[in-house]
Amino acid sequence: MSLNTTTLSSLTLTVTSVYNKKRPLPPSFSLLTDLSSVHHHKTPRKNKQKQKEPAGSCCYCCSQNRNEILIKQRPSIFLASSTSGSHRFFNLSTENKASMDHYIAGTLIAAVFLLLFVVRRNDSKKPRKVSTTYKTQNDVFRSSVNAGKNGSPTDVIIVGAGVAGAALAHTLGKDGRRVHVLERDVTEPDRIVGELLQPGGYLKLVELGLEDCVEEIDAQQVLGYALFKDGKSTRLSYPLEKFHADVSGRSFYNGRFIQRMREKAASRPNVRLEQGTVTSLLEENGTIKGVQYKTKDGQELRAYAPLTIVCDGCFSNLRRSLCKPKVDVPSCFVGLVLENCQLPFANHGHVILADPSPILFYPISSTEVRCLVDVPGQKVPSISNGEMANYLKTMVAPQVPPELHEAFVSAVERGNIRTMPNRSMPADPQPTPGALLMGDAFNMRHPLTGGGMTVALSDIVVLRNLLKPLHDFNDAASLGRYLESFYTLRKPVASTINTLAGALYKVFSSSPDQARKEMRQACFDYLSLGGVFSTGPVALLSGLNPRPLSLVLHFFAVAIYGVGRLLLPFPSPKRMWIGARLISGASGIIFPIIKAEGVRQMFFPATIPAVYRAPPVED
């Protein structure tokens, strides 16, 4: 039964009288919110004699004089019961007046909190710029991080926009990830390395949809190598018969290539490229949460994302917290640009087995040829006082092929001489939730074979395939465990190219040791045999056949071939001794490199549990 208007008026008048007269509530009083579920108590009356109820009224309280009676009687609250349809009165007493005050105060507080919740909820739905102040021990940094082009947070922060960083940004952006790229200098870089992309690297470029980045930059096709030693030469062509005509190596200006990749990445609507120098990673409870960086205006900012990928190159200042860097600098490259000259073998890289170490020539445009002279050790002749020019003219120029001699001397006289240390660093990661290392910041090898970009692009393909099934990267711990498989899955390509680069550099460098001289000559003669003896090693070098076991077999085949040359036609004790040292020297070259790369990961990856880890389960 519902309450009518007259009854509600009675209820209001009754409660008002209680507060006006400061009348207390009875001990039996209880405030009930559901009027359909109450216990009924008889209301005590002054006259115990039953009063006659007027016709048409359900109870005495519904009579014409009920308002007057309610006022004259002790104050009470009228309740209705839907179950019985009868009305009863509950007397108010003095003990629990404070309880009612508490109920009213609690109701007001709850209403205020509800109002705040509704306002905050509606406000959070609006796209906005997040602006937060972070206090540190030394200063206060003002972070003004765009929450995404569509008001959404960032999925991935990429530190560095070189070959690895730019290619990764485009790849993840194409997969729908929201990417924030921070690059120290967005102008076109000017480097003397990273200018030759092997055919295996070009295939990865095609797989990532970036093959047009080698167009419109005057890039030159590279079809193989030419090897020179003591006036003799041999041509080693890439085994490209099974591939499309466009598949080959490419050589170009590194800066032009990188700028094309940056433009391609920045064209994605969900990729934001910003100029800024990252100074540190932001760590919280062992998990990387983002980066702290300085803008070109000098403002200190912070950016946050569930995954931070560091690709800041060979001079990385962030790698120490993510890996165990063991950087070796076996030599330096001295770079020159030769103009208006023709290479002995068109569209081929040229390797001269000079004394004391190799010299490289390869085209970087339709009119220019890059020359890289390897100088062993970390100390090179001074450029400023003319020592370098004198060294190049007197020591190097006589060993340059006659077709290039004049152009080489002219390049030295022009004086545009550059140097670059050649770094080697095996991949030795420290898996850290929320962060990953890639590119030269993670793994380097001697640039003699031009395999760095091939390894970087191959790593991006592996990482792309691992991340593709994931909806988001918010569970840093689960993501970190899952991505441990990356370090093993990358090994076939990376370890093959790394090991070959380190081994070839040591074999191609001259040495006073007779066994090393024999090994060097045996390598040149082995590759000159043609057939499988040349296509096998070249397929390894080009990234077309990344098989570590095949590399080891060819390497020791060269050593055995060298021993055979020593023992035939008539072996002698001296020759046998040199042969034994040749085998020992070959083992001393390749086994330390394999150990650094990881024997189990190179040859027995199926025995590593991380390879079989499934993607984290989405909630």
Task: Give short role names for the model-derived ranges.
Residues 164, 187, 279:
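Conserved Rossmann-like nucleotide-cofactor binding loop
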Residues 109-125, 409, 465-619:
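C-terminal helical "tail/cap" subdomain of flavin- and related membrane-associated enzymes
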Residues 145-164:
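Beta1/beta-strand and adjacent pyrophosphate-binding region of the FAD-binding site
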